[in-house]
Amino acid sequence: MKADIHPNYKEIQVNCSCGNTFTTKSTMSKDAFHVEVCSACHPFYTGKQKIVDTAGRVEKFNQKFGAMRGKSAA
């Protein structure tokens, strides 16, 4: 292998918003990384269904583009 061409591969601490922490290896320059969802709290792995609030986004879309519904694309 050539010298000084490969990135520094080190252990980093991954912190989830649920409080779970684990260690992995990465080429990131930081020593810690924050994620919103991990295998300890993701619905696919836990088997629990999580309701995502999309009503606010739909209402915002309708307010922005709702007046265009009656008009034709001509």
Curated annotation (Swiss-Prot):
GO terms for biological process: translation. Keywords: Metal-binding, Ribonucleoprotein, Ribosomal protein, RNA-binding, rRNA-binding, Zinc. GO terms for molecular function: metal ion binding; rRNA binding; structural constituent of ribosome. Binds 1 zinc ion per subunit. The keyword tRNA-binding does not apply. InterPro entries: Ribosomal_bL28/bL31-like_sf, Ribosomal_bL31, Ribosomal_bL31_A, Ribosomal_bL31_sf. The keyword Metal-binding applies. It holds the Pfam family Ribosomal_L31. Zn(2+) binds at C16, C18, C38, C41. Its cofactor is Zn(2+). GO terms for cellular component: ribonucleoprotein complex; ribosome. Gene3D superfamilies: Ribosomal protein L31. Binds the 23S rRNA. Belongs to the bacterial ribosomal protein bL31 family. Type A subfamily. Part of the 50S ribosomal subunit. This is Large ribosomal subunit protein bL31. It comes from Dechloromonas aromatica (strain RCB). The gene is rpmE.
